[in-house]
Curated annotation (Swiss-Prot):
This is Probable transcriptional regulatory protein VPA0011. InterPro entries: Integrase-like_N, TACO1_YebC-like_2nd/3rd_dom, TACO1_YebC_N, Transcrip_reg_TACO1-like, Transcrip_reg_TACO1-like_dom3, YebC-like. It is found in: Cytoplasm. One of its GO terms (biological process) is regulation of DNA-templated transcription.
Length: 238
C-alpha cells in the first residue's frame, strides 16, 4: 500500500487518539460536575456551561449522556482534583490541573514529564502567584468601550477589556464568570462568544526558542499523554 498510506494511517491514529483524549477529559469533568452539583443543567450552571463547551468541541452526545447516567447511578470512580506546579524548560512557569482516582500515581506520572525534559516540579504556590485566575471571554467586535461600560453598569468586576485586530477580550475574576456571561448575553443577545473559560493568565511571559522550545513542546506532548491531566497553563512565549 506504500509509504503514503502508512503516513496517512499514522496521522489518522494520532487524530483518533487526540479525540479519545478530549472525550475522556470531558467525560470525567461532566461526571464529577453532575455528581457534585446535580445532573440537571438548568439547576447546575457549571454543568450547563461544561456541556455547552463540550458540544462546541464536538464531543458526541453519547459521551455526554454516558457521563450524566454514570453520575445519576451514584456509583463509579471518585475523582479528586489535583494541581501541580513547577518550572518547565527555558525557565517557564507551569500549572498542571488533573482529575485523579489515585493521587500517588498521578503525581509520579506528572513528575516524570518534568524529569524527562530536565524540568523541575515544585511545591504548592511555587508558580501560581505569577498567574491570575481569570474568567476570559473573546468575541468579534470593534467597540471595547461599549463592552466595558455595559459590564460596569451590571456591576461586573471587570479586570480588563482588550481590543486587537477586531477581536475583543474580556477579563474578569474567575468568581465573576457567570455574572459576566449573563450580562453579555442580556445586553447583546446576537453576540457569538468564541471563547468563554476560566483559566490561569500569566502576569508576564517568558520567551522560549531553539532547543528550549523543542523541549517545551516535548514537555507539553508528554503531559498530553497523561490520562489524568485535564489542563496545562504556562507562560511560555513560543
Amino acid at each position: 500500500m506504500g509509504r503514503s498510506f502508512e503516513v496517512r494511517k499514522a496521522s489518522m491514529a494520532k487524530t483518533a487518539g487526540a479525540k479519545i483524549k478530549v472525550y475522556s477529559k470531558y467525560g470525567k469533568e461532566i461526571y464529577m460536575c453532575a455528581k457534585n452539583g446535580g445532573s440537571d443543567p438548568d439547576m447546575n450552571l457549571s454543568l450547563k456551561h461544561l456541556i455547552a463547551k463540550a458540544k462546541k468541541d464536538q464531543v458526541p452526545a453519547h459521551v455526554i449522556e454516558k457521563a450524566l447516567d454514570k453520575a445519576n447511578g451514584g456509583g463509579g470512580e471518585d475523582y479528586v482534583p489535583a494541581r501541580y506546579e513547577g518550572f518547565g524548560p527555558g525557565g517557564t512557569s507551569v500549572i498542571v490541573d488533573c482529575l485523579t482516582d489515585n493521587g500517588n500515581r498521578t503525581f509520579q506520572d506528572v513528575r516524570q514529564c518534568f524529569v524527562k525534559v530536565g524540568a523541575k516540579i515544585g511545591v504548592e504556590g511555587s508558580v501560581s502567584h505569577m498567574f491570575d485566575h481569570q474568567a476570559v471571554f473573546q468575541f468579534k467586535g470593534e467597540d471595547d468601550e461599549v463592552i466595558l461600560e455595559t459590564l460596569m453598569m451590571e456591576d461586573v468586576d471587570v479586570t480588563d477589556v482588550e481590543l486587537e485586530d477586531g477581536v475583543i477580550t474580556v477579563f474578569a475574576p474567575h468568581t465573576e464568570f457567570f455574572k459576566t456571561k449573563t450580562a453579555l448575553n442580556a445586553a447583546f443577545p446576537d453576540l457569538t462568544i468564541d471563547v468563554e473559560e476560566i483559566t490561569f493568565v500569566p502576569q508576564t511571559q517568558t520567551p522560549v526558542a531553539g532547543e528550549d522550545a523543542e523541549k517545551f513542546q516535548k514537555f507539553l506532548d508528554l503531559l498530553d499523554d497523561c490520562d489524568d491531566v485535564q489542563q496545562v497553563y504556562h507562560n511560555a512565549e513560543l
